[in-house]
């Protein structure tokens, strides 16, 4: 930390407040906070992402043997796959502290410097939604990541002057659902870049059983598997569906969560046997009914169903692409034959 630097202390007190950066990041995701008790603490407890775990284990072990900070890490993939959890696990495995914030919370250079000032040697700064950091902030990060220092202007007008702030060796972990929005200079400064993949039903079944045990909610194997099939390959969704099914089981007086109560509960929640919800159905049905299955632009689809195009691109479209119900083409999105079949429509091959 640079607390012994009087120039920093004066600027720091006047320009920013680090607590609000950390609070804002936490307050932005109530669901993540509620899931803290469900998160594994170490790699050996983490289910799925086997190749990624093996790589991280090597990098972490090597950094600890050299007594160095871990290289900067970029994690990308759809929401809910465990990027934040992995950041916490890396901190635990390295036995260092972690500061957590989000890209939108870092609004000015002083915000970033304030966060970096909180770090001790080897600590981790985790930035969720790192693709949303402003360009001028991103440029300051270059020297911080490469050479562990930042230069920032202190004061205003004619009295403004550059001040050099040395930083301790640290690890930046960035998480994003949209890696294509990161600039090449920023992306190139991450030494470890990994994508998280959708989970298999078998992996999700293990996660559901583990979560049910934490909830002290008895669950049968076929019940856990049925939840996994409807969870869109995503642990966060699996845990959320389990919570709701647990409510149905309790009200119905069930001793354990079985496949029957899972089916009843999730049918009432309008989550079908492939994990598609109302928004998915509305998107596909609109494309079929009004645009003959496409091709049609994402903005047009969003306007038709009353959703933001950014929401559809980040939250809805990836899974439909993954399971083969939707295709991207140069002319727009197209519903596939599998998508037609799932919705019970006759497919007419386009010439």
From Swiss-Prot:
InterPro entries hit by this protein: AAA+_ATPase, AAA_lid_4, DNA_helicase_Holl-junc_RuvB, P-loop_NTPase, RuvB-like_N, RuvB_C, WH-like_DNA-bd_sf, WH_DNA-bd_sf
Compartment(s) where it occurs, according to its Swiss-Prot or TrEMBL record: Cytoplasm
GO molecular function annotation: ATP binding; ATP hydrolysis activity; four-way junction DNA binding; four-way junction helicase activity
Residues binding DNA, per UniProt: 328, 333
HAMAP family found in the cross-reference section: DNA_HJ_migration_RuvB
Oligomeric form and interacting partners: Homohexamer. Forms an RuvA(8)-RuvB(12)-Holliday junction (HJ) complex. HJ DNA is sandwiched between 2 RuvA tetramers; dsDNA enters through RuvA and exits via RuvB. An RuvB hexamer assembles on each DNA strand where it exits the tetramer. Each RuvB hexamer is contacted by two RuvA subunits (via domain III) on 2 adjacent RuvB subunits; this complex drives branch migration. In the full resolvosome a probable DNA-RuvA(4)-RuvB(12)-RuvC(2) complex forms which resolves the HJ.
Free-text comment on this protein's domains from its UniProt entry: Has 3 domains, the large (RuvB-L) and small ATPase (RuvB-S) domains and the C-terminal head (RuvB-H) domain. The head domain binds DNA, while the ATPase domains jointly bind ATP, ADP or are empty depending on the state of the subunit in the translocation cycle. During a single DNA translocation step the structure of each domain remains the same, but their relative positions change.
Family membership noted in the UniProt record: Belongs to the RuvB family.
Name the UniProt record assigns to this protein: Holliday junction branch migration complex subunit RuvB
Species name: Leuconostoc mesenteroides subsp. mesenteroides (strain ATCC 8293 / DSM 20343 / BCRC 11652 / CCM 1803 / JCM 6124 / NCDO 523 / NBRC 100496 / NCIMB 8023 / NCTC 12954 / NRRL B-1118 / 37Y)
Gene this chain is encoded by: ruvB
